[in-house]
Structures are given as structure tokens and as C-alpha cells.
């Protein structure tokens, strides 16, 4: 490429945290629809739903990281690592969900579901991946909703009165 030509920005690098979260919700809805459509048709039929669920999880965690001010380049350098403990702790994820995020990364599940045509086992059951996806997207969404933040107290709470008599 000639020196005077500037590379276009990496796709998504200019997206806001809210836009990334909105995209995660699109993938979440699609995953749920595809899981419903694949019921009773075996694991292979659920592969697209599984991939959408993994993408929804990753996007929601990335939205949280963007919301917290993490630079896009740092987020991108993580690849598909969902196991970072900081968002899990900050979001108040359940232990089972946090352990599942670590397992997803350890098994390289995103890459296996996406690229391995022979994959027939060793990936998360649909109820586990759906529970993880729903919890992550839900808890990230709660952190974006300003009505969920408790207002600061400006005065001391009233003291309790003792009953007389």
C-alpha cells in the first residue's frame, strides 16, 4: 500500500459502548430464535445458534470494557478470551457463569464452533450457553441503565423513633 494511503479504521473501532451492547442484544435475540428452531434436530443444527450466543457474550463483555474506558486496541488484542476476571467481578456474575466463561476460553469454544466441521462434542450444552449469555447481557445492560444506579444520599437517614408508653 502506498505511504500516502491511510488504512481505514478497524471495523467497530469507532463504535460506542452502547452501540456494541445493542449489537450484543441483536446476537442474543438471534441465538434464542435459532436455538428454538433447532430444538430436536441435534447439535449440528444448533451450531449457528451457539455461535451467535458466543458472539453475544463477547460483545456484551466488550461493551462493558468500552464503557469502563478500555481502549479498543486493548479489547481487540484479547481475541476471544472471555475469562478476564475484572468484568466478571465488576458485573457480579454468578460463580457458575464465571467458571463457564473460563471454560469457554480454555476449550477455545468460539473457534471450535466456528471452524471445526468435525466437532460433535466438547462444547457447552444449549441451556448452559443460554444461561451464560442471558446473565452476561442482562448484567451489562443493567450497568448501562442510569435508573439502576442508587442515588447518592444528601442527608442522613431519619432516626428511628422509640415507641413511648
Where do the language-model regions lie?
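Long, charged low-complexity segments
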Residues: 1-28, 32, 69-165
Amino acid at each position: 500500500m502506498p505511504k500516502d494511503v491511510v488504512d481505514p479504521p478497524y471495523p467497530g473501532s469507532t463504535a460506542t459502548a452502547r452501540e456494541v451492547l445493542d449489537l450484543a442484544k441483536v446476537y442474543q435475540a438471534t441465538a434464542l430464535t435459532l436455538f428454538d428452531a433447532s430444538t430436536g434436530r441435534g447439535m449440528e443444527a444448533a451450531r449457528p445458534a451457539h455461535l451467535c450466543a458466543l458472539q453475544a457474550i463477547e460483545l456484551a463483555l466488550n461493551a462493558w470494557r468500552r464503557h469502563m474506558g478500555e481502549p479498543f486496541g486493548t479489547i481487540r488484542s484479547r481475541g476471544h478470551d472471555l475469562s478476564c476476571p475484572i468484568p466478571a467481578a465488576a458485573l457480579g456474575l454468578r460463580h457458575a457463569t464465571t467458571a463457564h466463561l473460563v471454560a469457554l476460553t480454555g476449550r477455545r469454544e468460539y473457534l471450535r464452533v466456528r471452524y471445526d466441521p468435525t466437532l460433535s462434542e466438547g462444547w457447552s450444552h444449549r441451556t448452559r450457553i443460554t444461561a451464560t449469555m442471558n446473565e452476561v447481557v442482562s448484567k451489562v445492560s443493567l450497568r448501562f441503565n442510569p435508573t439502576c444506579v442508587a442515588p447518592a444520599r444528601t442527608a442522613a437517614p431519619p432516626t428511628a423513633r422509640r415507641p413511648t408508653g
